[in-house]
Amino acid sequence: MWGFIVALISGALMSIQGVFNTDVTKQTSLWVSTGWVQLSAFVVCVLAWLFTGRESVAALWQVDNKYTLLGGVIGAFITITVIQSMGALGPAKAAMLIVISQLAVAYVIELFGLFGVDKEPFEWRKILGLLIAISGIVIFKWQK
């Protein structure tokens, strides 16, 4: 149950963050806004680290799959693409397409066991669910 609650909070925060970041970008620039997002996130993480145990940062160099350390780089591109999509499509349409893309890519990762994730068997019902979600976007976008 806790996982569901955290996922719902995460989705809500992503939508709010996208709107905020898009507004900051309109008043500054894409790179200034993205840099601010990453810098402010870094400050929050450092403060949290200072107050919650101070685990060894050297543990990062012990990570088995070094490519997984690129999460922050990917995060910067996530920020940029969310800002651009929300600016072009509006928050609701952008969020729907973002979620569909997340769902499709996550399924492919599971299906092929990419990045060390446990491989899952192909299931038609998951494809059907994805198609229903895409249909929802078409209905949501439908204009008279």
PLM regions: where:
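Membrane-interface interhelical linkers
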Residues: 1-9, 26, 31, 42-67, ...
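Glycine-/small-residue-enriched transmembrane alpha-helix faces in small-molecule transporters
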Residues: 1-27, 77, 81, 135
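Hydrophobic/aromatic positions within or immediately flanking transmembrane alpha-helices
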Residues: 34-35, 95-96, 123-126
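Alpha-helical transmembrane segments of compact multi-pass small-molecule transporters, enriched
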Residues: 40-44, 97-112, 131
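Alpha-helical transmembrane-segment detector that highlights a single hydrophobic TM helix
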Residues: 63-76, 84
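Final/C-terminal transmembrane alpha-helix of multipass membrane proteins
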Residues: 129-139
